[in-house]
Amino acid sequence: MNTEIHLFRQARETRDLAVGESLFQVGDPGETMFAVLEGSVELRRDGQCVETVQTGGIIGELVLIEPAPRSLDAVAVEPSRVAIVNEREFVFLVQEHPTFALKVMRIMAERIRRNSGTPRQA
């Protein structure tokens, strides 16, 4: 996703996170996704890291496809800045940059595969 980070650099809304600061927690309502502009954010389940998302990565994209409460905790592991992307902005990006949509789908598929224990097909 690093090649698309330029799409988020001019985001209308950003948030700075200190080390250990929570971006969201399990059960929080999910209405936005985030793009990591700087730093690293861990995705955790029951306090255990399931993925570290670094500069250029995205977090929380699933709620823009299927609205639901957050299923993981997201915590900054170094000083970080994230772009906040709402549904309207997400739809615009998908329509204007079809390769962005494909990359989001690949990220989602990889996360689903990793969490289900399904091996990757060749």
Regions found by a protein language model. Name each.
Residues M1-A122:
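Cytosolic regulatory regions built on CNB/CRP/Popeye-like sensor folds
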